[in-house]
Amino acid sequence: MLRRIAGIPHPYISRVSNATTRRRCNATRFSVQILRSQLRWLGHVLRRPQNDPLRLVVFEPDTELCPRLTNTGRKRVVGRPRIDWAQTLIEMFCNFSQVSRPRMLEIVSDKQRYHFIVERLCSQTALIS
């Protein structure tokens, strides 16, 4: 679809790489767009009140950034990841921005600052891949 938008003729579609097409259209990778959306949604969830149902689904009540099933004493079913989706995003954000988990809550509460850090993370990810 992006090749058609870029005006690449049909006989040459298979000869033009994805990177060239993205460069011509000034578009980003889908994986970077998905990461940006996931991190922004995580920030939205973390800005919710502690007893909000959405936050309770992602995190256990009365714990700071402690995803469910980590301290329950149960093992995960065979084939399931050891850490869940929210935990993965939190670790990625903390490693990139070099902040601790409690400090992350302060950063998330400032929406503009959090969005700036997310954009920086996504631009770094786009350069790497």
Go through each PLM region and give its residues.
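Short linear motifs embedded in intrinsically disordered, charge-biased segments
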Residues: 1-129
